[in-house]
């Protein structure tokens, strides 16, 4: 299941470097408004890619029995639902990649990105997995759900940081034009 999900993540991996290149090209030209425009374009592409990958993951989840004919029904069932949960957060995962590896670091916001990843992973994802799996007895569903929760929280935090941060305006003291 993870292999199939990772294929879609790799397919979107070029968006973050594209964000860095296009934003810094605009910054080099001295235009913060152009940098913001490039960031918004990359975000639209990331949203579209995430939605497309969601649809493709849902399709892939139905192909599991054909791809893995010698696997038991219980494993196929868990894998099917795991892929559906992964598909539901695919847009958030792609946006997290673009925000965390492209847009926010372009605004010299790397420390925030690292802190957000640490907090989301170790203060949200891991405790949620422990709670869902051990305390509530959800097993694999708890792991899938805690990963989804972590990705959604990161996407919200990164979006809010992008939307309301002054980091891009502070870049090299560039005036808005």
Predicted feature locations:
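Small-residue-rich hydrophobic transmembrane alpha-helices
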Residues: 1-61, 94-113
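Short, flexible coil/linker segments at or flanking structured domains
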Residues: 3, 11, 52-53, 63, ...
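Short runs within selected transmembrane alpha-helices of multi-pass transporters and secretion channels
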Residues: 13-16, 86-106, 112-124, 128, ...
């Amino acid at each position: 299941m993870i292999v199939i999900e990772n294929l879609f993540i790799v397919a979107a991996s070029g968006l973050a470097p594209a964000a860095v290149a296009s934003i810094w090209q605009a910054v080099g030209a001295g235009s913060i408004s152009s940098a913001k425009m490039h960031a918004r374009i990359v975000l639209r592409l990331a949203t579209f890619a995430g939605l497309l990958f969601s649809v493709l993951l849902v399709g892939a989840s139905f192909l599991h029995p054909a791809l893995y004919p010698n696997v038991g029904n219980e494993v196929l069932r868990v894998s099917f639902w795991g892929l559906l949960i992964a598909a539901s957060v695919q847009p958030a995962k792609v946006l997290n990649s673009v925000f965390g590896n492209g847009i926010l670091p372009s605004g010299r916001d790397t420390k925030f990105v690292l802190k957000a990843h640490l907090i989301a992973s170790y203060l949200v994802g891991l405790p949620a997995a422990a709670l869902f799996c051990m305390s509530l007895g959800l097993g694999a569903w708890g792991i899938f759900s805690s990963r989804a929760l972590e990705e959604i929280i990161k996407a919200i935090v990164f979006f809010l940081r992008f939307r309301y941060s002054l980091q891009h305006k502070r870049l090299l003291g560039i005036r808005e034009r």
